[in-house]
Every structure is written in structure tokens, then in C-alpha cells.
Amino acid sequence: MASPVVSLLLVGICALAFVHVARSECCTSRELVEFKMDRGDCEAVRAIENYPNGCEVTICADGVAQLGAYCGQGSCNIFGCNCDGGCLSGDWSQEFVRRNQQYGIQIIKVTRLPF
């Protein structure tokens, strides 16, 4: 009969064999974009009015207004990590302007969050 220490060690080694390499990317970054529009209103791009500057929206890297708490392609855990499909990618505010070029958006200020 093996000692309890050896048995626990063998169980631990076997358990490690089933563990996959984990890479938990967190999708908590976002940008707060303040901008003016030549045409249309703030709601057209899912933004809110920010008087007197124009409009304000929080976007993900793909240039789309943030939906939900995080910027993952799919659902994320409660910390914004391990999102199904990884994080959204793109050129942030540049992508926002490209996607909404029909409104003549002029960026005033961009703040990346978290700092």
C-alpha cells in the first residue's frame, strides 16, 4: 500500500495532465469619445448629447458603441476575462469615424479606459 503523500502526488500529476494551457485575455478596455457631427443627431450612432461639446459615446476597439459591460466578441466572465471568441479588435476611434462617415464626425477628445 502506497503512502498517502505518494497517492496525493500521483493524483495531482494526473490532474495536471488534463489541464489545458490557459490564456485569459481580459476585454475591459474601452474608449470614451467626445465628438461633433455635421449631419444627424447623437442617437444615430448610439451616443448621448454632451452639451456644449456635441456628443459622447463609449466604444470598443471595433468602433461600435459598447454593448454590455465588456468588449468581448461573446460572453465574458464576471471580471471581463475569458470572453468567448476573444476581445473585439480594430482601430478604436478611427474605426468609429470610418463606420459613421455619413454623419461627418469630428473627434474632439478620446479617453482610453481603464487608464
Swiss-Prot record:
Subcellular location field: Secreted
Knocked-out gene: effects: Mutants have a shortened lifespan and succumb more rapidly than controls to SINV infection. RNAi-mediated knockdown in fat body leads to accelerated aging of the intestine with intestinal stem cell hyperproliferation, epithelial dysplasia and accelerated induction of apoptosis in the aging midgut. RNAi-mediated knockdown in muscle had no impact on systemic intestinal tissue aging.
MF term (GO), any: cytokine activity
Transmembrane portions of the chain: none
Disulfide cross-links: 26-81, 27-87, 42-55, 60-71, 76-83
Expressed in which tissues: Detected in hemolymph (at protein level). Also expressed in the fat body and is probably synthesized in the fat body and secreted into the hemolymph.
UniProt-listed GO biological process terms: defense response to virus; immune system process; response to bacterium
Domain of life: Eukaryota
Any one Pfam family match given in the protein's UniProt record, by short name: Diedel
Keywords tagged on the record: Cytokine, Disulfide bond, Immunity, Secreted, Signal
Annotated signal sequence range: 1-24
Expression induction or repression: By viral infection with Drosophila C virus (DCV), feline herpesvirus (FHV), Sindbis virus (SINV) and vesicular stomatitis virus (VSV). Strongest induction occurs with SINV and VSV. Highest levels of induction occur 6-24 hours after infection with levels declining steadily until 96 hours after infection. Induction requires the dorsal-related immunity factor Dif but does not require the myeloid differentiation primary response protein MyD88. By muscle tissue stress.
GO cellular component: a single term: extracellular space
Function: Cytokine which promotes survival following infection by Sindbis virus by suppressing the immune deficiency pathway. Following infection by the enteropathogenic bacteria E.carotovora limits intestinal stem cells proliferation. When secreted from muscle or adipose tissue, can attenuate age-related intestinal tissue degeneration by inhibiting apoptosis.
Domain comment as written in the entry: Contains two subdomains, SD1 and SD2. SD1 is composed of an antiparallel beta-sheet covered by an alpha-helix and displays a ferredoxin-like fold. SD2 displays a new protein fold made of loops connected by four disulfide bridges.
Family, as annotated: Belongs to the Diedel family.
Note: The name 'Diedel' is the German translation of Tweedle and is based on the fictional Lewis Carroll characters Tweedledum and Tweedledee due to the presence of two subdomains within the protein.
Stated name of the protein: Protein Diedel
Organism (species): Drosophila melanogaster
